[in-house]
């Protein structure tokens, strides 16, 4: 979101410098012109570092450690590298080719990637069936000089209200990654599809917006987004908010594609019939 733009002094009485767009233009030109090249370390330290997790933090750390001369191995439990960038952010917001070209650069700099490898408990039947290899922390400690934990946070915030167990109620991190996998050509055993359905997205943030856009692309009959907080102002009072990131109404491309937005709504009950969600009981907040 480029929060620094809100703190730009020009933003007090005019428009801030669009540094996000400027930096995008610079790096896009750099890749197009071939200015971005691998930078392998000139000298090796002889030290081995294991990076656990291949999301933004893991990839950034792996690159800097490799350039410092360390031998870096990145362990990723999923089938592809990228973490939230690859599986959480929809393709219509982030084309995965941007991730792939950075991974190619890291490989050229000496970084080794091990996918389908879970760092955790002892191997069991469930992980074996999924084709995932389990490596214990003790094994890594014996093989590496340092471990960097960059696993991220994948525990969803639940909504513990009656009816939560009904079929058809999904976490965003169940819904978004499976669609990204489908886009990549992965066969899904039980895909979650909004096609022809009336969809309610609970949560008014960026993740909710991503779910709105995904549901629209799947052919949802209708999409409604619920936000617990009251509707923010269309325009912030800069005398009060500057230099902080302002709270104001933000409309994404997903909203523009088709979405009804409701504010100050709290969901109290998931209603259902025969184990399937059929509606919600909500209250309007004051």
PLM regions and their residue ranges:
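A Rossmann-like FAD-binding core segment of flavoenzymes
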Residues: 97-158, 180-189, 216-286
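Glycine-rich dinucleotide-binding loop and its adjacent helix/turn
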Residues: 26-43, 104-115, 156-218
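N-terminal Rossmann-like FAD-binding beta1-loop-alpha1 element of flavoenzymes
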Residues: 48-73, 207-218
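Glycine-rich FAD pyrophosphate-binding loop
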Residues: 70-86, 223-233
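Cofactor-binding loop segments of dinucleotide-utilizing enzymes, especially the Rossmann-like FAD-
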Residues: 54, 77, 204, 228-231, ...
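Ferredoxin-like iron-sulfur electron-transfer modules
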Residues: 1-2, 35-52, 57, 86-87, ...
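Short, hinge-like loop/turn segments at secondary-structure boundaries
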Residues: 90-94, 165-167, 240-246
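Iron-sulfur (Fe-S) cluster-binding segments and ferredoxin-like electron-carrier domains
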Residues: 2-29
């Amino acid at each position: 979101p480029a929060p620094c733009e809100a703190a730009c002094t020009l933003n007090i009485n005019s428009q801030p410098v669009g540094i996000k767009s400027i930096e995008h233009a610079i790096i896009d030109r750099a890749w197009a012109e071939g200015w971005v090249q691998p930078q392998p370390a000139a000298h090796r330290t002889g030290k081995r570092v294991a990076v656990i997790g291949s999301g933004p933090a893991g990839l950034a750390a792996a690159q800097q450690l490799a350039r410092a001369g360390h031998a870096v191995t990145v362990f990723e439990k999923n089938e592809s590298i990228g973490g939230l960038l690859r599986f959480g952010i929809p393709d219509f917001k982030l084309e995965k080719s941007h991730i792939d070209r950075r991974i190619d650069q890291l490989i050229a700099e000496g970084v080794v990637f091990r996918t389908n490898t879970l760092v955790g408990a002892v191997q069991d039947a469930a992980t074996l069936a999924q084709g995932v290899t389990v490596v214990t922390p003790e094994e890594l400690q014996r093989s590496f000089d340092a471990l960097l934990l960059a696993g991220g946070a994948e525990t969803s915030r639940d909504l513990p209200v009656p009816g939560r167990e009904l079929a058809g109620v999904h976490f965003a991190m169940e819904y978004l990654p499976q669609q990204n996998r489908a886009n990549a050509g992965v066969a899904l055993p039980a895909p979650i599809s909004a096609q022809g359905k009336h969809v309610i997205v609970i949560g008014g943030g960026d993740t909710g917006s991503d779910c709105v856009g995904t549901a629209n692309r799947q052919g949802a009959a209708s999409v409604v987004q619920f936000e617990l907080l009251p509707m923010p102002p269309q325009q912030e009072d800069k005398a009060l908010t500057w230099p902080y990131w302002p709270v104001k109404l933000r409309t994404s491309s997903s909203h523009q594609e088709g979405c009804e937005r409701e504010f100050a709504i709290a969901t109290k009950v998931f209603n259902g019939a025969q184990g399937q969600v059929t509606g919600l009981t909500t209250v309007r907040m004051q």
